[in-house]
């Protein structure tokens, strides 16, 4: 039995194409280990000690890893990775391409990721953030994260110095 063809199929096809490739950003699950090189390139734009493609490939193959990517016009603009254990998760990294920063896209990415974590039974989320990263601190506070501790000398800086990390937690229930 064949399915009837809508008289609007050209429009429906165009709208589906536009949604996938148009300028409107969207968030989608990140599951493909073959995206590891793209993740490594984006990560290198944000961190003094970036992770390599093999590290990302290994993480994406782990069952405990949860990830989402932010896409716009067919290109990955950012991503977030977490590791889930029982009813808790740790955000491992959040990255936006330099061209995507400052427009509220990190809020959208984090909101959708936290919503997904809540749906799969995560009650509490933890993370570490550089104490000097004011935009990230503002973003996390907006999403209910509170400071619970510090780790002195945790992050390596480009100049060889070490920066303090703030440990933060948010309850999703």
How should these model regions be labeled?
Residues 97-111, 118-120, 124-125, 130-138, ...:
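Conserved glycine-rich acetyl-CoA-binding loop
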Residues 2-8, 65, 124, 130, ...:
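Conserved catalytic core of the tyrosine transesterase superfamily
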Residues 86, 104, 108, 131, ...:
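Residues at secondary-structure transition points
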Residues 8, 13-103, 107-120, 169-173:
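Acetyl-CoA-dependent GNAT
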Residues 128, 146-162:
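Conserved catalytic-core motifs of GNAT/GCN5-like acyltransferases
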Residues 58, 132, 155:
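Positions that flank functional sites
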């Amino acid at each position: 039995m064949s399915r009837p063809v809508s008289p609007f199929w050209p429009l429906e096809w165009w709208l589906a194409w536009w949604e996938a490739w148009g300028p409107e950003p969207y968030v989608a699950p990140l599951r493909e280990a073959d995206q590891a090189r793209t993740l490594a390139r984006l990560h290198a734009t944000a961190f003094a000690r970036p992770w390599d493609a093999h590290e990302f490939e290994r993480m994406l193959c782990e069952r405990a890893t949860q990830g989402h990517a932010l896409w716009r016009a067919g290109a990955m603009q950012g991503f977030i990775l977490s590791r889930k254990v029982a009813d808790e998760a740790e955000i491992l990294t959040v990255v936006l391409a330099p061209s995507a920063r400052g427009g509220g896209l990190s809020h959208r990415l984090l909101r959708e990721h936290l919503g997904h974590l809540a749906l799969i039974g995560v009650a509490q989320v933890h993370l570490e953030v550089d104490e000097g990263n004011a935009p990230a601190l503002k973003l996390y506070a907006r999403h209910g994260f509170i400071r619970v501790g510090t780790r002195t000398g945790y992050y390596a800086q480009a100049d060889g110095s070490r920066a303090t990390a703030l440990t933060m937690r948010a309850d999703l229930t």
